[in-house]
Every structure is written in structure tokens, then in C-alpha cells.
Amino acid sequence: MTRQYWLRWFSLHGVPRVVLRVQSRKGDTFARMMGPEGIADPHPYIETIRSQGRLVKTPLPWVTCDHALVRSVLRDDRFGVRSSARIQIPKVLQRFANRVPPPANPADPPAMLRMNPPDHTAMRKPVVSAFTPRAVKKLRDTVETVTEELLDAMPSGGSIELVESFASRVPIAIIFDILGMPREDQEKFLAWGKDMTPMLDVGISRRTYGRAMQAAQSLNDYLDRHIEKLRREPGDDILSNLVQSGDLDHYALKANASIIIGAGFETTANLIGHCVSLLLRLPEQLDRLRAEPQLWPNAVEEALRYEPPVFITARQALTDLELEGVQLPQGSMVMLSLAGANRDPAVFTDPQRFDVARPNANEHLSFSYGVHACFGASLARMEATHAVRSLFERFPDMRAAAPPRLRQQLTFRGYAQVPVHLGRKVQVTPSTVA
């Protein structure tokens, strides 16, 4: 990592990392939730924060786990996402970090995750066209084909690790089709994505940040070549359309392509992993799905509620404002626990229970809300529903081979490994699992 990037890491992650450790030792609940204990099981910390009020002050940001308040902040145009920092840091460090531009990546401007209207609106509009319900419906055949190919390759009676061999493979194949990229390059992108997603966490290590920067640079180099190719030979895909439209400059094209790639497969892979792990752990819920297969879409909504692929997000006050009777000066950061909102007892009965028939499971906030709501939500739902149902119908005796292992990340919360014994393979026609 170059000296410039080391200083950027120090500004955005090094200082918060030290502060979080110090506050964790002092027993601060938020700091402990953001550390190794919280990654392993964040919910005791969430409930402690919830018991302290709807909006809770910590030594770093404000925090809320309240469903109504999280939803309100997400749609409030007095809040935005302009800061590159994930928690509040001194202005001098923020200014310095902004003077050291990183390779285009999903975590920094001009990526849509870090833009506000009207710039965000202008960048989002041409991308959303690839993810409308009508466009997603057209992708269903591709999702079914990719899923069946992966399941066909799995050995009857064998043991595999599902994240690497299945959960990540379905969404990356679909994203590659959307972006007009050759499938033989998927392995590179899976590796780059694995290294880059920690950039969205708080206080990552210097080594982790260095790997992320290397992956971001490799992705940039690839996208430079791919975008130039699309200028000469455009295809029938969203990235070709963006290149040919001229609406985005070259750097913005790369930043937003990296979002489509990263968010497009990382969140869906996490969702598939959570669905499989939950159903293996709770066989009575799987039995109900077998008896009532019409519940499969709702089961995916409940998995989104119970284990959201994105655990927490943040918003920054764009002006002096009042929230819950508290005066927040401009620049104040509010951490929004999507996982906490999704288990708010004011909204969900018996919220700590996973129930595939929960009548209001779809009231979760796992895909965010407001102007930054996930534009790929319909696609993620469709992919996960088909992939998970097909997996369990092809391998009805599948069971866990070992406890699943979580990634050491909190923002994008998912499994690094889900080892399973597949058991016998059953041949199922695509129409049966449609």
C-alpha cells in the first residue's frame, strides 16, 4: 500500500479503530457491537441499545435500532451520505482523506452509495432500467439455467462448501450477463469482491485495507479495458448503454460498475447463505415449506428480516436539525441498525423467532428505504427464492457438515463457509421449482 493510501486508511479507519477499541474496553455497547463479539452475535448489544431509547448517544455516533426511526431517517432529505467516513471523525482527517482519491470502488464517491440527489438521481436513473420488474422477469430463464447447471454439477452423496460452490455463483453469473462480461472472468471478480467488501466496514485493519485497495486497482484496470472495448463494440447490456450514453465520465462508470458487481452478488450470496443455514438449523421450518411450497417467497422475506445481508448503515446530518427532540449539528452521524429495526417488537411479534409464515415479514428494511433503496432488490429476491428452493428439492436429505463460519465483517454480514453433506440427488424438472 502506498504512503498516500496508508494515510487515507489512517484517516478513515485507523483513528476510528483505536477509538472503538478504547471505548470497547470501557464497556461501550456500540463499540462492543462493532467488534469481534458483535460480529459473532450482535443481537444482545442491539437489545441493550434498544432498551436505552429510540435514539442513543455513544462516544462516536448516535445510534438507533428503532424501526420507525430508521425508516424515517432513510427517507429524510435532511440526511445524506456525503462523508466517506463510516462514523464521525475530525474534520481535518475527513478533508485529508478526501484529497487522496482511491481507485474507483463502491465505497467512495462518485459511486451511488456515496452520492445524494440530484447527483445520485442522475447516476441511478440509467442503471435502474436494468432492474425493473419487467427486466428482472426477463432474467428468470437465465437464473433457472445457471441454477440448474450448478446443481447438476454437484455430486450425489457428496460434501461441499455452499458459499464458494453455489451461493456466490448464481448472482455473479447473472451480474455478468447484465454487464456483458465474459463468464470466464468470474473467478477474478469473486476474489476481488471478497477483498473489497470490508471497505464498507468501520475500523478495518491496515492489512485488510491494503488488500482492498489492491483489489480495487485490479478491478479498475480490468474495467478500463472493458469499457474501452464497449466503446468500440457495444453490446445489449446495461454497461454498454451507460458507456454509449455519455452521461457518466470514465471514473464514474467504473465506480458504479463496481457497485453493480459488488452489491449485486455480495448481498445475494449472503442472502442465499443465510436462507440455507437457517433452514438446516430449523428443520421444522423446512418441513412447513415442503408442505406449503407457496410460502417460499415469504421464507426469503423472513430470512431477509431475521439475518439481513447488510447489517448497519449510516446517515449524516446535512444541516442543523432536530431528531427525536435532540438537536443534531450539521455533520452529525447517525448509525442505523437495519438488523435492529428488523427485530423491533413494536413491528414484529416474537421478533427473535424465525417463522417462514410470518404475515408481515416483508416489512423489513434490509434493502434500505428512500432514495438509496436497493435497486436490485427484485432480482435478489427472485434469485434467492429459486436458488434455495431448487437446492432443497434437488437434495432433500441435505444436512450441515459443520457449523457455518461467518465472515469477520459487520456491514455486509454473511457466511464465509457453509459446509454441507448433500445426500441423495433427486431429478426435478424446472417447472416443479418455478
Task: Give residue ranges: language-model regions.
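Cytochrome P450
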Residues: 1-434
